[in-house]
Amino acid sequence: MYAVEAEMVMKYERPLAAPHVGAWLGYPADAKVLLVHADDMGLCHSVNVATLEAVKGGMVTSASLMAPCDWFVEAVELAKTYPEGDWGLHLTLTCEWKTLRWRPLAEASAVPGLLDRHGFMHRSVLDVAAHATPAEVETEIRAQVEHALRLGFRPSHLDSHMGTLFATSEFFEVYRKVALDYGIPYMAPRVPPAGSSPVETALYRRFATYTPQLVEAGEIVHDYLQTDTGGQGLEERIAYWADQVRGLRPGVTQFIIHCGQEVDELKAITGSYRSRTWDATAWQSPQLRHVLEEEGVILTTWRELARRQPRWRGGVEPEIGE
């Protein structure tokens, strides 16, 4: 007990000396540690159900909920039925859909820059960056955390829908500030991902200038982040993810997936309903389970990573109350 604690404190004092975050957190230097994380719970009923089923399956190890969405309350209630799950808060400043629209939780007069001409959230990250102030962003993300807490839900971590909180250095600073104020770990990879779009790639590359100081401060809990996906059809999707698992590097990696069901509700929202169904099914398949075992991958959660991280050990246990 004491030897382990002493070793972790020693590593905390010299985190940049470790070959990767995983080694600093106490994993073997050659260990491939993986978070499989489902975004967008709260978007709609079918996404909620599909995400819960995937998390219960065991290979999807974490998920995050969107507080401004109409189905957020149901998402929290479903999370309460499975407290063993690892549930975070997907801080949301955009609403990209054509017919499904939501508004900020903060008073409109307090966050005018977050509103489009119809009073909804902007559809794009660039619009948020062009119109919103850091103060407005902070007001809104605090409102989302407070809304979750009022519902008896203390998230295991915070992350950012569409990467909006990485759009400017000022947005990132308020994201970090709110996380530290509440004592909740926040998603920030040591190595920026290639991403699935030029905009996303640019966002994370801008953030990369911060990573050494964040590692040194003990706030980074994973090395690599993968936000894109591939493969048309279920079999190709399984093969795609199998290849990604086989290509894992030593350290802590987070895969981001999106779960859904092929039902009319989700079809009415997005043309990517099939892709969400493929992700949900792939990550409950025996084929991927076999590849994970074959590659010796260690599946983990945000809670476990935070427990290993001296910066967050004091307040990581999520609470899902009545």
Which role does the model predict for each range below?
Residues 186-187, 269-322:
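C-terminal domain-boundary segment and adjacent tail
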Residues 25-98:
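Active-site beta->alpha N-cap acidic-glycine motif
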Residues 51-57, 72-86, 103-116, 149-150, ...:
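Acidic (Asp/Glu)-rich catalytic clusters
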Residues 33-35, 60-64, 84-90, 155-159, ...:
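Structural preference for beta-strand elements that scaffold enzyme active sites
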Residues 1-35:
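N-terminal pre-catalytic segment of deacetylase/amide-hydrolase enzymes
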Residues 134-219, 231-237, 246:
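Catalytic domains of cell-wall/extracellular-matrix polysaccharide-remodeling enzymes
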Residues 102-129, 272-274:
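Active-site gating loops and adjacent loop-to-helix segments of metal-dependent hydrolytic enzymes
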Residues 39-41, 66-68, 90-96, 161-163, ...:
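Active-site beta-loop-alpha junctions enriched in small/polar residues
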